[in-house]
Every structure is written in C-alpha cells, then in structure tokens.
C-alpha cells in the first residue's frame, strides 16, 4: 500500500515539522508515504468571495494534477464524514482487499478546497467539527495513519 498526502503550502513551524518527520519514520515499516506539497496562492487582503473561490480553484488544479491514476482519493474537509481510528484502519484494509494499492489524502490550504476537489474525492473525511490549521492536520493525519497500521497489525500503541 502506498499513501500519498497532497497538501497546499509548506510547513513553517519547526515543532510540526519535527512531528511529521517522526511519524514518517514510524510509518516506514508499514507503508510508503509520499508527501506532495503544492504552492499556495497569494490571498489578496480583504479578498472578495469571488477572489477566495479563484484562490481555491488555482490551488485545487495544482493538487488534482498530482493525484496518481487509479488512486483512491480521500479529501479532508470539516464538512466530511467522521471516522474512528478503528474505522480508518478497517477502511485501509478494505481498500487493500478491493485491489487499491494507492490511497491519496488531499488537504486544502488556508481557505479550504474548491468544489472540484471535493467532487473528485471518493470519500470526504472530517477529523473533527473543529477547524484545524492545514499544517496541523498533516501531523494529525500522519499520527492517525500510524495508529491505523498498528491496529491492522495488532501491535500495541492504540488504546
């Protein structure tokens, strides 16, 4: 199983980068993880609704052109469906059984995702009703993926 994490923008905070690096290292025995960052679009000050949509569309185009063919696409969005850690593990197992060798998670930028990206997703996932920074959600996603693979393998970590 190959996991792709596609995200808008670069991580600037050292503490988040350290956490991401740690979970990427922990995931190596279980799966290959590729993190693909696309440039974020400059947001005009006092941006209008139309300008906001334009930013999301441009970022969305950059994301979508990097999605591998035949990949199962999970889009992270606050309006998506919640899932437990056990549910994520089961979903990954089920996707493997269905013949998927590639899962792509898409994380939007500061303004979220375009409707086109949301429509492209095979599943829209919400980690919480709360809003997190797009940088923080990358770390949370990696931790949940690590937890999911530990659950799948029946190894201690998940309580």
Curated annotation (Swiss-Prot):
Species: Halothermothrix orenii (strain H 168 / OCM 544 / DSM 9562)
Matches recorded under InterPro entries: Alpha/beta_knot_MTases (IPR029028), RlmH-like (IPR003742), tRNA_m1G_MTases_N (IPR029026)
Gene3D superfamilies: 3.40.1280.10
Binding site for S-adenosyl-L-methionine: 76, 108, 127-132
Record-stated family: Belongs to the RNA methyltransferase RlmH family.
Molecular function as annotated in GO: rRNA (pseudouridine-N3-)-methyltransferase activity
Broad class of where this protein is predominantly found: cytoplasm
Protein's job: Specifically methylates the pseudouridine at position 1915 (m3Psi1915) in 23S rRNA.
Subunit comment: Homodimer.
Entry keyword set: Cytoplasm, Methyltransferase, rRNA processing, S-adenosyl-L-methionine, Transferase
Intracellular or extracellular location(s): Cytoplasm
Name used for this protein in its record: Ribosomal RNA large subunit methyltransferase H
Catalysed transformations (reactions): pseudouridine(1915) in 23S rRNA + S-adenosyl-L-methionine = N(3)-methylpseudouridine(1915) in 23S rRNA + S-adenosyl-L-homocysteine + H(+)
Pfam family, one: SPOUT_MTase
Main enzyme class: transferase
Secretion signal, residue range per the UniProt entry: none
GO cellular component: cytoplasm
EC number: 2.1.1.177
